[in-house]
C-alpha cells in the first residue's frame, strides 16, 4: 500500500500508521476503525475529556484511569484500548483527533476511497451524514468516507475539505465576507 508522505510525517500520522499496521496484521482494521470512531465522537462531545487529554495538571495515571473507565462504556476493542492507554502513558492523548483522522485516511487509501473532513457547529445526524455521503459520492464518482468533527465557532453551516479543496459554507465565513463587503 502506498502511504502518503505528508500523513506519515506528522506525529499523529506516525502513531496512526503504527496502529494501522498492527490492526492490519491482526485483521482488525474495521474493528479498530469503529472503536476509534466511538472514542473520537466522545472526545469531540465531552469537553472534560478534551481538557483531561490536553491538561498537564493531571498525572498520566489519572488520564489512564479515565480511559480505562471509558473503554467498557464505549465498547472499545482490546487493541484500541491498549493504544489509547499508550497515548495516555506517553502524554499524547491530546493528539487523538489527528491520529484518528490519519488512521481513517490509511483505511481509505487501502480501499481507494476519498475522505471528506466535514466540520459543523453541531453533530450531524445519521440521516444528514448519509445524505452528505451520497451527494459527495455522486459528485466525486468515488466512494467517500466522512470524517465529521464539531466546531461551535463556525456558528452554523459546514466546511467540507477534500484533499486540497475546501468548501466553506459556514455562517462564520459568510459573516466575515459580509463584514469585508461593508467595509468597502
Swiss-Prot record:
Classification via InterPro entries: ATP_synth_OSCP/delta_N_sf, ATPase_OSCP/d_CS, ATPase_OSCP/dsu
Location of this chain's protein in the cell: Cell inner membrane
Keywords: ATP synthesis, Cell inner membrane, Cell membrane, CF(1), Hydrogen ion transport, Ion transport, Membrane, Transport
Bilayer topology: Peripheral membrane protein
MF terms in GO: proton-transporting ATP synthase activity, rotational mechanism
Domain of life according to the entry: Bacteria
TM helices/strands, residue ranges: none
Annotated GO CC locations: plasma membrane; proton-transporting ATP synthase complex
Oligomeric and partner information: F-type ATPases have 2 components, F(1) - the catalytic core - and F(0) - the membrane proton channel. F(1) has five subunits: alpha(3), beta(3), gamma(1), delta(1), epsilon(1). F(0) has three main subunits: a(1), b(2) and c(10-14). The alpha and beta chains form an alternating ring which encloses part of the gamma chain. F(1) is attached to F(0) by a central stalk formed by the gamma and epsilon chains, while a peripheral stalk is formed by the delta and b chains.
Family from the record: Belongs to the ATPase delta chain family.
Record protein name field: ATP synthase subunit delta
Amino acid at each position: 500500500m502506498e502511504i502518503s508522505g505528508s500523513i506519515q510525517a506528522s506525529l499523529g500520522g506516525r502513531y496512526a500508521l503504527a496502529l494501522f499496521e498492527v490492526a492490519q496484521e491482526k485483521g482488525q482494521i474495521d474493528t479498530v476503525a469503529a472503536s476509534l470512531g466511538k472514542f473520537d465522537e466522545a472526545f469531540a462531545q465531552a469537553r472534560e475529556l478534551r481538557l483531561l487529554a490536553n491538561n498537564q495538571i493531571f498525572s498520566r495515571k489519572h488520564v489512564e484511569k479515565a480511559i480505562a473507565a471509558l473503554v467498557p462504556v464505549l465498547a472499545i476493542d482490546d487493541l484500541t484500548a491498549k493504544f489509547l492507554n499508550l497515548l495516555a502513558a506517553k502524554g499524547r492523548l491530546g493528539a487523538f483527533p489527528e491520529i484518528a483522522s490519519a488512521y481513517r485516511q490509511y483505511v481509505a487509501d487501502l480501499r481507494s476511497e476519498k475522505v471528506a473532513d466535514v466540520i459543523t457547529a453541531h453533530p450531524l445526524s445519521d440521516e444528514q451524514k448519509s445524505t452528505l455521503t451520497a451527494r459527495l459520492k455522486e459528485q466525486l464518482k468515488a466512494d467517500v468516507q466522512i470524517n465529521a468533527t464539531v466546531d461551535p465557532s463556525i456558528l452554523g453551516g459546514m466546511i467540507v475539505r477534500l484533499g486540497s479543496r475546501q468548501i466553506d459554507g459556514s455562517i462564520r465565513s459568510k459573516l466575515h465576507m459580509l463584514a469585508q463587503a461593508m467595509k468597502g
